[in-house]
Amino acid sequence: MPIQILPPQLANQIAAGEVVERPASVVKELVENSLDAGATRIDIDIERGGAKLIRIRDNGCGISKDDLALALARHATSKISSLEDLEAILSMGFRGEALASISSVSRLILTSRTAEQSEAWQAYAEGRDMAVTIKPAAHPVGSTLEVLDLFYNTPARRKFMRTEKTEFGHIDEVVRRIALARFDVAINLNHNGKLIRQYRAAPDPAQHERRLASICGPAFLQHALAIAWQHGDLNIHGWVADPAASHTLSEMQYCYVNNRMMRDRLINHAIRQAYQDRLNDAQQPAYVLYLDIDPHQVDVNVHPAKHEVRFHQARLVHDFIYQAVTAVLQQTNAPILNISEEGEVDAPRWQQENRVAAGTNKYAQPEAAKSSAAEQAVARERSSARERAALAYKEDHPYQKQQGELYRQLLQPSAAAKPATSPAAIPASSVSSPSIPVQRITQAEEPLHGDNYSFGRVLTVFPPCYALIEYQGGVALLSLAVAERWLKQAQLSPPEEGLRPQPLLIPLKITLDKNEIAACQNHEKLLITMGIELSVEQGRATLRAVSLPLRQQNLQKLIPELLGYLSQHEEISPDTLATWLARHLGSEHEVWNVSQAIQLLTEVERLCPQLVQSPPAGLLQPIDIKAALATLTHE
């Protein structure tokens, strides 16, 4: 078959395959056109789930007689005229495909009148060449579009339409989403002659909650947390639901970019990540969020139905949304790690070359000066086995099976860096820290591989935080919470030149009292040593950087607590402060599993080998298996 230009009707029907998926798609496109026309009232009439009739009437600016024929043509639009316009879209529509595509798979009638015209005009397209016929009609200022017999000429498409109830349910959901985007517009939805939804205009922000309650329900409004966050050209506002009520609100997920409703994976991932430590795998967050961004920084022309966008600075937007939602959720009463203050001791210290400069939460194992090739091979094999187990955990993590698996790998520079959870309180008896001898590890000392520097194989984990391990020919219980605290204490103990600060993507504003401001000024050098860059102006502090172990913490809460602690001491050593911080940081996991335990112990063995040689009280408890076996075998 030779190459030929397709007839207009066939070309439009091909385009309709992307634009017109079902009756709800038609409603979305036509209502968005009404919004672009400046309508303040939109009436929607549906018959038989949209299969028989879809009528959209608005009081917008209307379409002049001269433009009616063009309105039904492909690639004809009043929204853009140049590439520069396309790169800064604020209107809902811009491709000029909707009306032509809809008219190719239905009987579409467009009636419109502008304020300058004394009479209205009606247009419809028919035939193979989609010729447009125009005739006078009676109509107020505004437009009415009637879509009759959708898919009448494409039986295959009509066959795939669902029941009347299902199709109207999709239409209802589209109208709900649009109503949440435009509080200033009154919208009425009728089905088979019966009024189903009536959303009155709510131009006053104080009235927005009324529409929010009518769409999302009183339960959402009761548990909603208002959010308002801004950074440069980025602004996010709206409501997120208290995680405690998520089990009843899982279907309430509405997100908008420049008032355009979205189901974007990056946005969903950022929100889900903010909630991940507060919800189990079966729960979903509930939210109504509005993201305002410079239109030059977002490309909306990447999805046929415009449900997804592409941000020019995707990581910035992702972290902005994550930080904003996280800051609001932290206002809820989440459990806080409670560790006893008794027995503070300095953390194990070692040479700086054992530290990785930046970019990951891993620390390198010191080189062994006196190790044979065979010993090194054994050490590499043990390390490789543990790393494979840790990698298996990352690949099987329940959250990565949710939406955004690709984005989690794409947007997080380190798979090991996760937002801190809010663990349950740990008994003080399990985390006491008796004084133990601490020696600096040098290259001249005994190598750090071999059984002397390994806890042993993890057999199982007893919730919430105890691992059963092989130990010295027997078994022992190990407290993962205590091991994690010692690891963080070691990571936070600075070398002579101090911890390296890691700049925050978005500087954090923190309100301080007089004592906290004084502590910030008096201990400025100490904070710099700990990798914390904090400046104070007019009673407000700006946090610009923290050391790597602190990046995933609740800094809005941790920094004031840290300054409050410093205000009680005129002089304090970096190691003492590292001990205090380790006791007040959130745990990585509320309930541990075997893979997480293996990953933690691998890091402890590399970074704190002294804990393997001389376990502190509360870390390890050997179990007398021989006595238990003797009891079982006793006759």
From Swiss-Prot:
Q: Which Pfam families match?
A: DNA_mis_repair, HATPase_c_3, MutL_C
Listed InterPro entries: DNA_mismatch_repair_CS, DNA_mismatch_repair_MutL, DNA_mismatch_S5_2-like, HATPase_C_sf, MutL/Mlh/PMS, MutL/Mlh/Pms-like, MutL_C, MutL_C_dimsub
Output the PROSITE patterns linked to this UniProt entry.
Answer: DNA_MISMATCH_REPAIR_1
Any one Gene Ontology MF annotation carried by this entry is: ATP hydrolysis activity
The record's keywords, sorted A to Z, are:
DNA damage, DNA repair
PANTHER family, alphabetically?
DNA MISMATCH REPAIR PROTEIN MLH, PMS, MUTL, DNA MISMATCH REPAIR PROTEIN MLH1
Protein name (database record)? DNA mismatch repair protein MutL
Q: Organism, per UniProt?
A: Yersinia pestis bv. Antiqua (strain Angola)
Q: Which gene encodes it?
A: mutL
